[in-house]
Amino acid sequence: SVVDKTKVDDLRTDTTGNITVDSISDNKTNLGLVNAFTDVSLAAANISVTDVVTLAQANTIHAYNTAAGTTVTLSSVSDAFSNVETLQGTAGVVMTGATITTTTAEAVTKANVTDLNNFTTAKVTVTSVQDSRSNVSDIAAINNAEVDMSAAAVTITDAVTLAQANTDVGNLNSLTTGKVTLNKVEDGRANVTTLAAIDNDDVDMSAAAVTITDAVTLAQ
């Protein structure tokens, strides 16, 4: 049967002999405490982790069970995309039902999000996105129960207009409550001026390459 640290503690009071665990489910802290017991072996145990872990933490736990065929099943993962990707490819680690959060340490693209959504049947939350306007819109269109970017910091890599970046519903700033950063802007002078006047906490074009599409005078 599946045990947790509380049950292991009970077993240790019942016997002075060594205890071999076949299956354990608990949070990462308790799993570490159980593994540290000199009279308890997790080497042949299938391990389920009940709280969120990073790649480094999952690797630590995966070192507890060294027997062939044993698994570490994760319920929640939070790390940079490349670390999540590495974890997904780690033999003996199961994350097909884990919630996944990619951190701001690494912005994700539409292609990355597609991979993440294929890693798990549970919800994927992305906190930083960087891609073309079309691809960012595609990510936002995915049901939030599958992929949620509603609070992500977003960087748009191709040129956008005022209409595309406006705060009105249906445009870029409506896709997230996070900051939208524009790398390129291309529009008429008046529209670019209006766009630049939007609060930088909402839409920031302060470092954008700007192309003015209509005629301007020296005075303008």
Name each model feature, range by range.
Residues S1-Q220:
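General marker for long, soluble alpha-helical cores
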